[in-house]
Amino acid sequence: IFEYVPNKYSVTDENLKTSDAIEIKIGQATKPGMGGLLPGDKVTPEIAKVRGKKAGEDIISPSRFPNINSKKDLKDLVDELRLKSEGRPIGIKIAAGYIENDLEFISYAKPDFITVDGRGGATGASPLLVRDSTSIPTIFALHRARKYLDEHDLDIDLVITGGLRVSSDFAKALAMGADAIAIASASLIAVACQQYRLCDKGQCPVGVATQDKELRSRLKTDIGAKRLTNYLNASLEEIKTFARITGTAASIVSKIILPFSMIAPS
């Protein structure tokens, strides 16, 4: 999924067309209402080329889209991305805050999916004060989002994320009405992350969040890929078990397990 952010990292027509989907990032639960900063010492020539920026200079991502000031503005962007990407699914991601008000606003744009990011998710680069004190916990956010979409008869897929780590978390989210679950930190941990929380320093000792050549050499991508595959496949099998013991196997298989199988090869 191509994440479309305010400063338009790596936005080209080709990238939009070759993505599986495009997600307009309005907010993130660990730092709602805040932008982002990639320090210049992490902007290597390789990163600069990918992001269309100058090597060695800080890259600042604004906290909001300057061209989105109304429902119509957001709808225009969704329509534009749908056209440029030749029909790729377009989603909108929000931090779990004013959920009902936010859903009312963004549903006007008629996205294909909405991602609600609840408190409990993580990034090693968020201020602790904000990360630990803002946004609505994921499960409560899911309940409110599902309720709103159902009450307003909105045919928009609901993706939930934020602190969901293991199969029982995924099964609970599906049972509560999520159409899909997005995972981030859990995937990084499966690959190699040991949560040293040095992501913003460029000194990750296991080589996951760094551009240092020596540190990067410690990350064995073939092993990490295998571990991630094992994590996804094990989660899939455990979701099947939850589906069987709750008598929902048929609906879960058609809705979740078949697509999941496609992204978790053996």
State where each predicted segment sits.
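Amphipathic, soluble alpha/beta structural segments
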Residues: 61, 65, 169, 237-243
